[in-house]
């Protein structure tokens, strides 16, 4: 227990010291070269901000939903060892049906189309 306390104390102290140094060092000698963006030795050609596609964001959200579905269905084989394996099958089928209906709805609304 004493070893864990020592390690946590050292970690917190070292993190605080490094964070303080990282904020303090750039303020010692600021100049234009340090404050400008670096593009392989060339002057920046354009804005660093690019427009973000909303469709990409929607597809990323759909991916996260289906990834979460897989995480929910992974323990399904162990559900057979419960007292009521039929109930486990019913709930997993309900989750799959709900997500399939959501995917069909998104598809029919055109949310998965890249071209407008």
Swiss-Prot record:
Chief site of localization: mitochondrion
Source superkingdom: Eukaryota
Membrane-crossing segments per the record: 3-23, 56-76, 85-105
EC number: 7.1.1.2
Record's keyword annotation contains Cell inner membrane: no
Subcellular location(s) per record: Mitochondrion membrane
Keywords from the named record: Electron transport, Membrane, Mitochondrion, NAD, Respiratory chain, Translocase, Transmembrane, Transmembrane helix, Transport, Ubiquinone
Catalysed reactions, semicolon-separated: a ubiquinone + NADH + 5 H(+)(in) = a ubiquinol + NAD(+) + 4 H(+)(out)
One example GO MF annotation: NADH dehydrogenase (ubiquinone) activity
InterPro entries named among the record's database cross-references: NADH_UbQ/plastoQ_OxRdtase_su3 (IPR000440), NDAH_ubi_oxred_su3_sf (IPR038430)
Class of the enzyme per the UniProt entry, highest EC level: translocase
Topology of the protein relative to the lipid bilayer: Multi-pass membrane protein
Keyword Protease: no
GO cellular component: mitochondrial membrane; NADH dehydrogenase complex
Family membership noted in the UniProt record: Belongs to the complex I subunit 3 family.
Record's function text: Core subunit of the mitochondrial membrane respiratory chain NADH dehydrogenase (Complex I) that is believed to belong to the minimal assembly required for catalysis. Complex I functions in the transfer of electrons from NADH to the respiratory chain. The immediate electron acceptor for the enzyme is believed to be ubiquinone.
Protein name per UniProt: NADH-ubiquinone oxidoreductase chain 3
